[in-house]
Design a protein with these regions (language model features):
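Flexible "cap/lid" loop of the alpha/beta hydrolase fold
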Residues: 239, 248-278
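Catalytic active-site module of serine/aspartate enzymes centered on a nucleophile-bearing elbow/loop
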Residues: 380-411
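Feature captures hydrophobic
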Residues: 1-134
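Short beta-strand/loop motif that positions the catalytic acidic residue
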Residues: 350, 356-358
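Conserved HGGG/HGGXW glycine-rich cap/lid loop of the alpha/beta-hydrolase fold
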Residues: 142, 147-193
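Acidic catalytic loop of the alpha/beta-hydrolase fold
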Residues: 361-365
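Conserved alpha/beta-hydrolase catalytic His-Asp/Glu region
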Residues: 280-347
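Active-site loop/oxyanion-hole signature of alpha/beta-hydrolase fold enzymes
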Residues: 133, 139, 147, 185-229, ...
Length: 411
């Protein structure tokens, strides 16, 4: 794996046309970021733009005032690295920031949501509808952050991330599906930029919140796509509120463990509120865990891996972030597999068309679950990706999006 320094040097040493030097970057910054939107004016934030040899600029937003300073000032909320030509293209609206990130032409460190809100600062004349717009809404009494992309009249799809992740874990899917769908990607309560209620975060709670979210964004019903824990949430919505769901796509969904429950007694004794105690985690350790989720981590851009690790470390550094993580992880492990309220006992009651996708090298949700799903839901469509880990939407983005699109259009 390339070092972080090597990655940044690669991004910043790209060929730069003469017109895209320091003067062009600063002019683009002044022209665009000096005129923030009303929403951006409410934010208190600091962004650093690093354009290699062309220079570094700091943008401060505070109480409606925006200042642009040459150089780096203190600790930023986020840093954006790109060669000058790419940065100018993004600032002037010729290139979407998400597209540049997915293509490896732009690198983000720090708060991913803050960098995604860059579009709210720019107001390009011709905005790509695939570029996600950042919003906040109250759902179930929780301030909830979400991304939205695509045309308003298109078929709605809601994307639900996994444990410890955020809406950014679906960026490739957002960019692809929003060509012909209206796509929402949420930060579930307790994660990312959404508020972090100190309470049990189990599938039933998230299903109720999901219905409230659909109400808040005026969606009578939608297709739901969930990865890992998000898949479990999507299933619960389908079981409890089928009238709000068109179709379900479950990407390596977490489901009640049928075995390996030997630690259940101990886990019940450990209270998530212990997360109030500081528990620092190292970026390199998080990066190692993230890489283990992929069959071949080299398929995923190093920039995306580092951005995801940054996001986890940032959220987990807060007491509420740690408590939320422990609450959600505890609920996953302790869910009853059998009995009147058991997951596998209830699953046959799922009435909505469902597509399950498993990775044959996923150590978190082994493909052996496929047989249990087939027995409980004979009508479900089940696919196994060979040489794939736990996050197919990043390891095989084109294949995953194509499969979803075909499933949404099937009779």
């Amino acid at each position: 794996m390339a070092s972080l320094g090597a990655i940044l040097r690669g991004v910043l040493r790209r060929t730069t046309p003469p017109h895209a030097g320091a003067e062009a970057v600063e002019a683009a910054l002044r022209a665009r970021i000096a005129r923030p939107s009303d929403r951006a004016a409410l934010r208190k934030a600091r962004l650093v733009f690093h354009a290699g040899e062309a220079g570094v600029w700091t943008v401060d937003l505070r109480q409606g005032e925006v200042t642009l300073t040459r150089g780096r000032l203190g600790g930023p909320g986020a840093t954006i690295y790109a060669d000058p030509a790419t940065l100018v293209d993004v600032l002037e609206g010729r290139l979407a920031g998400v597209q540049a990130f997915l293509d490896g032409r732009l690198f983000m460190r720090g708060n991913i949501a803050l960098t995604l809100e860059l579009d709210d600062l720019l107001h390009p004349a011709a905005r790509d509808p695939r570029s996600p717009r950042c919003h906040r809404v109250s759902a179930g009494g929780v301030e909830s952050f979400y991304l939205e992309a695509g045309e308003r009249g298109a078929t709605p799809v809601v994307l639900l991330h996994g444990l410890g992740a955020t809406s950014a874990s679906f960026l490739p899917t957002i960019w692809d599906l929003s060509r012909d769908h209206r796509v929402f990607a949420v930060d579930l309560p307790g994660f990312g930029e959404s508020a972090k209620p100190v309470r049990p975060l189990h599938a039933a709670y998230y299903a109720r919140w999901m219905v409230d979210f659909l109400d808040a964004v005026a969606l009578p019903r939608a297709n739901l796509v969930g990865n890992s824990m998000g898949g479990r949430v999507a299933l619960e919505v389908g079981l409890r509120s089928p009238e709000r769901v068109d179709r379900l796509v479950l990407l390596c969904p977490s489901m009640a463990w049928r075995r390996y429950r030997f630690a259940a007694g101990l886990v019940r004794l450990l209270r998530p509120e212990l997360g109030v105690t500081p528990l620092p985690v190292l970026h390199r350790l998080v990066l190692g865990v993230l890489r283990s989720l992929f069959a071949r981590p080299e398929r995923v851009p190093d920039a995306a891996m580092n951005a995801a690790a940054d996001e986890f470390v940032r959220v987990f550094a807060t007491p509420r972030g740690r408590i939320a993580f422990f609450h959600a992880a505890r609920a996953i492990y302790l869910e009853d597999p059998h009995g009147a309220r058991g997951f596998w006992s209830r699953l046959p009651g799922l009435s909505r068309p469902s597509l399950f996708v498993f990775g044959d090298r996923d150590w978190l949700v082994p493909r052996a679950f496929l047989h249990h799903v087939g027995a409980a839901l004979p009508s479900a469509t089940c696919e196994t990706f060979s040489d794939c880990g736990h996050v197919p939407q990043f390891e095989f983005p084109e294949r995953t999006s194509a499969l979803m699109r075909a499933f949404f259009l099937s009779p």
